[in-house]
Each structure stands twice: as structure tokens, then as C-alpha cells.
Amino acid sequence: MRQALPLVTRQGDRIAIVSGLRTPFARQATAFHGIPAVDLGKMVVGELLARSEIPADAIEQLVFGQVVQMPEAPNIAREIVLGTGMNVHTDAYSVSRACATSFQAVANVAESLMAGTIRAGIAGGADSSSVLPIGVSKALARVLVDVNKARTTRQRLTLFSRLRLRDLLPVPPAVAEYSTGLRMGDTAEQMAKTYGITREQQDALAHRSHQRAAQAWAEGKLAEEVMTTYVPPYKNPFTEDNNIRGTSTLADYAKLRPAFDRKHGSVTAANSTPLTDGAAAVILMTESRAKELGLRPLGYLRSYAFTAIDVWQDMLLGPAWSTPLALERAGLTMADLTLFDMHEAFAAQTLANLQLLGSERFAREVLGRAQATGEVDDAKFNVLGGSIAYGHPFAATGARMITQTLHELRRRGGGFGLVTACAAGGLGAAMVLEAE
């Protein structure tokens, strides 16, 4: 094992995560229908600051992410600062790393803390699948640019006459990888076939996720980390994730048809994450700054790792690549973990990564490591359910996982937890957290 890389400031301060919060997550076009991501971000950051009672000027930086970009608000982070009553001089910028976006936001704030340029910051992300940037065809876009430069009505009419009826149709956001043309579900199907993952195994994992999430809500474990939201017309509060199927049975999952490979596939809408709206954020500080403000941290960031692999085959293997690196940098092994939380983009993707984490062959032949990262104990794995149940607002999921894992570690008396996710473009992310 290589030498650990401690995440501390020049003064030896650890990176503390003092609090975290999220909105309830809503299926596309339900509770947050018509609410843009920037407003969801304002909701969660405003409430997080109000609950923490931290002086507004104590937050020196806000790093926020959004995957489904809205042209009218390209820097969502700055809009959140301006829309929540934060100090107008607060540094704010936006990041995007697909499904690992808020992992990146947390890493960026942590690096600012370690560099000594700030002592406290907020990281998070928000996405809306209900408010989408509907575009126009390339032909219409080109004509509109040319029309804007045309000098006469005749020139404008000539330009418009080149268009066909189909050129006027709206163009929804792309759901496929730009470089390959493959949808995420196509990659999940690849992985199911490559690693021999059956439909029954996928449905069982999805069912487990929903059952665990429903139980977590029923036992009140999520109440402290999920805010109550009010949206127009402000008649009813929205308080809980609305995708969780607590009363479903395995027989219900078996009824669904494959969603991507219609003839021979095994990936369905039920064993995949749904399109979701929501936001999540965490406050990070140096350990000494938290003490100055009289705050007890939820926990500490022990290490993180980001990886990238080829996109043409089985590209959602980010956790299998980033997990050993994050553990190594933390000076830990899989056996040292109290909790292991993996983003469930698809049941097939999740099961494939779990399989490879325990594979000696994958470790030697692909990662170039002497031994496997280690089998993941089912008693430690996604103990409160995962993204298949909660939903997946792309940029918010990492912050949800971090907050949820730290709260659960505290309930268990402390320990180490690892959170990890795959992401579009063959990217992966993992973070090791510590709670006392």
C-alpha cells in the first residue's frame, strides 16, 4: 500500500463537515414541477444557513453544481449567493462532474480549506428534470443567427424559406453520451451481460433499496437531514421523497418490461434510478474554525479520489476504480469501514461494481494491484437504501450520500464510511468519511 495522504491544513486542522441538508427528492414532473434547479439550490442553502446559525459572513466560498444546465443561469453558485442573503462578497463558482458533481464541489471546498484561502465554505448541487433547456434544431439555430444579421425583410424571408417543417420541432436535452451515442441504460445492459447479472438479482437489489429507504423514513432517521419545502401555490408542504415504494413486492418488479434492450434486456424502469428533482448541500470548515464557532462537526473528510476509464464498454465502473484509491489515501482497508454507500444508478451497475471490488483477477489484470479491494459486507452496504429508492437529482446525490452516511455513523458510535459513485464519461468518485 502506498503512503496515506492526510487531508489537513498547514496548521494540522482536519477538514470538518459540520452539517448537511437536502430537499425531499421528487420524481420528474411531480412535487417540484416547474421549479428550476437554481430555486431548489436557494431553498436548501438558505435553510441550511438558518438551521446552522452560522454568521452569514463566516461562509467565504460556495461551490455548487448543476448537470442539466440552464442557459439563463450558467453560474448557479453565484445566483444562490445573491438569492439567499449571503454576503455579496462570498466567492462562488459552479462545477459539473455528471453524477459525481457534488463530490467535486466538496473536494474543491476542501482544497480551498487546505490551501488556507478560506476557513469555511458550502458545497452542493441541484438539478431539475422537470425544468429542462428545450432547444432548437441546428438548422433553425443557424438560420436564427443569420436572420439576426440580415439587413432587409427579403433577406430574412429567404433565410426562413430554407427551413423544413421538421426543423421547427423542439429538441429535448440529449440522453446519450456525446462521444459514443450510448444511453446510460445501454451501458447498464452491457454490464449485466459482461458480468452475468440476472434480472432477478437486479430486481432483488432494487427491492432491497426501497425497503431500506422506507424503513429509514419510518424510523425517523432522515427527518433531521431533509427539510420541509413549500412551492407554488404554497398550499401543501412537501416533506418526504416521493419515489420510495415501501409496499412493493418482488412480483411487482417482475412485471416490467426491459426499458433499453427490448428483446433480450434485463434493465427496467424499476431497477434503475428515475429522473428526479432536488438539491443538497454541506458546510465544511477547518476543525479549528468549527471550534471557534462552538460547532460539533458531523464528521471529517478523510480522503477522496477521482478516476476515469474508457467509455465504450462498461463505463460505469467508477466505484471499482476509485474505491481502492480513496482507501489507500486514507490509510485504510475495506475491513476498516463501518459503512459502504454506493450510488445506485442502475442495479446492474451496482452489482457489477460490487463483484469487481471482490475480484482478485480484476485487481491484478486491470488495476495492477496485488490483491482485491475486498468484498463488501452486506450488513455495511447501503444500509438506508440508495438512489434507486430515493431518486437521483444528478448534482445533488453526492451531498445526500455524505450527509446520510455521517448521520448513520454517528448513530452507530462513529467509525469510517466510504461513499462512491459512477458518472457519465467513464468517471468515478469515492470519499472516505470519519465520524467520532
Swiss-Prot record:
Q: SUPFAM superfamilies recorded for this chain?
A: Thiolase-like
Please provide, in alphabetical order, the Gene Ontology terms of the cellular component aspect for this entry.
Answer: cytosol
For the biological process aspect of GO, one term held by this record is: fatty acid beta-oxidation
Q: Which CDD domains match?
A: thiolase (cd00751)
* Its EC number(s): 2.3.1.16
Q: Which Pfam families match?
A: Thiolase_C, Thiolase_N
Give disulfide pairs as residue numbers.
none
Enzyme active site: C99, H392, C422
UniProt record similarity statement: Belongs to the thiolase-like superfamily. Thiolase family.
* Function according to Swiss-Prot or TrEMBL: Catalyzes the final step of fatty acid oxidation in which acetyl-CoA is released and the CoA ester of a fatty acid two carbons shorter is formed.
Oligomeric state and interaction partners are given as: Heterotetramer of two alpha chains (FadJ) and two beta chains (FadI).
**In its UniProt entry, what is this protein called?**
3-ketoacyl-CoA thiolase
Gene that produces this protein: fadI
